[in-house]
């Protein structure tokens, strides 16, 4: 089998199949994401999705745990820094947000992600 085809099956088809199977069991979006994270704890995209789902449903303590775990496992996952910092600002925790933004600015700079870098610098200047 072609290595690219194998990667497509593992990273695209398998998760979609899993979603369809789980959806048939009437799982919530959060339960589906939790199952993905349990299956692949190092998968940044799944953990980011879970953290964002927790933010969107108001479970900020679970969101914080997932953002911190994500950044511990995948320190180069730049979008997480901005979203985590925005959540902390809404939670009236500007000092914590500053710390996350400073880490995120460093990560975005290393990654060459100028858009995220400018957004994080702008948010940091507002705090």
Regions found by a protein language model. Give the residues of each.
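Canonical positions in the second alpha-helix
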Residues: 35-36, 69-70, 104
